[in-house]
Amino acid sequence: MPLNKDIKKVLVIGSGPIIIGQAAEFDYSGTQACQALKEEGIEVVLVNSNPATIMTDKEIADKVYLEPLTVEFVEKVIEKERPDSLLAGMGGQTGLNLAVELYEKGILDKYNVKVIGTSIESIKEGEDRELFRDMMNRINQPVIQSEIITDLDSGIAFARKIGYPVIVRPAYTLGGTGGGIANNEEELIETLTSGLQLSTIGQVLLEKSVKGWKEIEYEVMRDSFGNCITVCNMENIDPVGIHTGDSIVVAPSQTLSDKEYQMLRSASIDIINAVGIKGGCNVQFALNPHSFEYAVIEINPRVSRSSALASKATGYPIAKVAAKIALGYGLDEIKNAVTGMTYACFEPSLDYVVVKIPKWPFDKFQGADRVLGTKMMATGEIMAIGSNFEAAFLKGIRSLEIGKYSLEHKKFKDLSMYELRERVVSPDDERIFALAEMLRRGYRIDMVSKITGIDIFFLEKFRWLVEEEQKLKQSTIDDLNREWLLKLKRRGFSDKAIADMLKVSPDEIYRLRDIWHIKPSYKMVDTCGGEFEALSPYYYSTYEQYDEVVVSDNKKVVVIGSGPIRIGQGIEFDYASVHCVMALRKQGIETIVINNNPETVSTDFSISDKLYFEPLTEEDVLNIIDKENPDGVILQFGGQTAIKLAKFLKEKNIPTLGTTSDQIDLAEDREQFDDLLERLNIARPKGKGVWSLEEGLEEARRLGFPILVRPSFVLGGQGMEITHDEEELTYYLTNAFEKDSKNPILIDKYLMGREIEVDAISDGEDVLVPGIMEHLERAGVHSGDSITMYPAQNISDKIKEDVLDYTKKLALSIGIKGMINIQFIEFEGKLYVIEVNPRASRTVPYISKVSGVPIVDIATRIMLGEKLKDLGYGTGVYKEPELVSVKVPVFSTQKLPNVEVSLGPEMRSTGEVLGVGRNVFEALYKGFVGASMYTGDKGKTILATIKKHDKKEFMELSKDLDKLGYNFIATTGTANELREAGIDAKEVRRIGEESPNIMDLIKNKEIDLVVNTPTKANDSKRDGFHIRRAAIERNIGVMTSLDTLKALVELQKEGAHNRELEVFNLI
């Protein structure tokens, strides 16, 4: 059946900011869906609050509303645009929940908007735990013994009846949020309370634990005529009990018998038919490893993280096909873009193995509880493709960028067998290395399988890898022959791993490979196991025979991607990479992308001329460059992952376009950079590197407190802190030198000024600054965690002139051709430079969208030799728009147990939203709403615990808050000072004192906002840490910067929260 002619204008709801459990996969699926709709001549209206996405670009939708994803604001868009249809399944859990809410509140009926694709009734049957369980019982699909729980007492009673352990699964939440495994009543009370609070309908499913069973997933498609196919099945190497987002996953499944495979496939199709899915659906099963017993865990009646993985693993574009089905097409009418011959009703066939490994953020949260369970904690993931499991798995390990190239990890060498067993039984992000060490020491495979729930098939593969590592370590380079080296390469060993074990350099192994003609061949991902010729140039490396790459003589450029999503290097860099590829293709240049992230738009095979799904290591990148012989490589847009390849590529005489490794060194080496600033007469905060506690204290006395301290070599502000006195500095330096005595600690005078940021473009002669951004929080809060305003609101014309002058001088002196990011501080009327990055930064998507300057496109054309003056955007500072746009960071700390919440010099946010308004107050209010921050709309009781350095400033703000009708609760010191200022304050006892104390008030949700300025962040022994954690875990607003509080006060004084706010189409 062809296109439904009644559908002319479709509203697509995006997924909002990147958070743990909902990452870049929805930018990929949303972009695909929008493009599929536009292909059919349908007008696309997009609502999404996330400015860092490709899907919010003017090329992707006809109208783009970067507005909060709430019923209030989406209704305004519907009222203004009058779409006839709504596509709900492309925006993750956020989009699904919002669609259900719009339906239930009668808004869709009010404006006559039809839901296309999977219906609201089907969504409810998939998402509501009780409806889903009843449906499974009706179609005789086994479910785990369970009960729908809406209050604590009935949960406790049911758990006593079925016995522990039990699993808590909240309804309508994301990534297992609020859920977990409870082994006893005490744990149940804690987990159940959290789950009931965080479920949007106050409902959880309490079920008997089948921890240790295999977890199997099927990705299924169904059209409105009842045609069904399974796109892909996937096997979690980790058993049930670890969230699938935190599990290592392999596709296709490796350990299922044909009977098990067909049994679960049939069950998937029965389920998707019963629920009435129209589009894509993910079905998760628990399978007893010792029998054919299975149970349905849950379904996702939408595109998901798993569907993005299945799309990339097979080449089957699930989101695109789902969008076409929503328009009325049948699977047998939708062409397969990979082959150009077959149709979407053909089930993909895989003749390779795919492995997904999660990327966790624990490097940013040293004190975090790393034990994995039913709550997802990974920020991103990598995918690796190989001709066998071992090859894909080792590619995956080196793709994680954790400095590991094999299964050996030094930290596990000295552990006793008992300690290793504990690390394996309570799995964390490093379990695979502990498990490998157990196998290395000869621990019986059947025993390892028993205690981990990991199938013997995988353990035998790991043991083989470990045994080969041991053989290498007992050998020399002279023992290595062609046959052995070829076997190792076929099983995924990198040159570096082999070299490390033989104690030679990787270049030596590369030389031997060259002599013995051991070069990788590249195979195509074609969806059909080679049965039909494929049109999509989408490749993975193998050391088997037959190469499927056709190398052209065209002018070509390699673009290095940014790898997995992590804190400090998020979706913004994928945005930049994709725009670079688009710009190159417009210029007629063949583009080759290398990346390994299955969630992103850059790894959609339709984006570039060729896609290599490979690790971003020196060897893997060099192999592709050797094969393709490009005219240049672009590193500027792939974040630190790409930039760190600059020196290696220079050594190999491979040309990089834009910034060179020498320019990177000049910007990042402190001494060289200080010399440059001195020559240019540009100020920076005074400071130096110190090697001891005594030297550090002496330097601090010379500079005067407060002092910013940090390790020498850090990314994303890792390990940075502001110290206010000698006691704090001594504490920091003592710990820092204990961790690393081989490198200096950098000590800078901390200037408590206004932070200013620019992304600029230089062609070596002229400089264009698309916009000057102002950070709301003063210097000392990492730029990625600060609220950012454009146009700048509080900067004088003189400072703006200095910003442009310094930017020009730095860009031209460093020799930038392309992009440069500079961060400044304005302190007491003077401008200081604090950081220069000779590459794209995380603010590029934001400033591109709100200034209207296509920054990446221009920077790419400059790298190809064009000049700014010829590109139509002028030079100097670009004209400011009428609307004000505020970028607000979004944090996922609620999902990570025992991690710090407070703002500081180390970045912690995972995503961002945009607020757009006629003035800064309207924009701030929208930003606060979009980021789910406290706005004062629902309650006005503030708990204030303020450090001594901040009390004077807080007292001024509290007077305004008092006038605005806020109530204060505070501990003795702050309460007394509030009363002295004429403000009524209720006194509360400290933690540890008799009830009711601070923690009781938080647990009982008698507080609406916690304002807590930390004395020492990252110190889990302090009361402040526990107050912040307790509040965030109960969805109570927390502000740790008085600048954020001041913004709240200002927008309330201006009445932005009471005003009828417009929504803006940014195209």
UniProtKB/Swiss-Prot annotation:
Ranges for region Oligomerization domain: 402-549
Annotated segments matching region Carboxyphosphate synthetic domain: 1-401
Annotated region described as Allosteric domain, given as residue ranges: 933-1067
EC number: 6.3.4.16, 6.3.5.5
Gene3D superfamilies: 3.40.50.20, ATP-grasp fold, A domain (3.30.1490.20), ATP-grasp fold, B domain (3.30.470.20), Carbamoyl-phosphate synthetase, large subunit oligomerisation domain (1.10.1030.10), Methylglyoxal synthase-like domain (3.40.50.1380)
Domain of life, source organism: Bacteria
Ranges for domain MGS-like: 933-1067
Binding-site residues, Mn(2+) 1: 284, 298
The protein's name: Carbamoyl phosphate synthase large chain
Organism name: Clostridium perfringens (strain SM101 / Type A)
Taxonomic placement: Bacteria, Bacillati, Bacillota, Clostridia, Eubacteriales
Name of the gene this protein is made from: carB
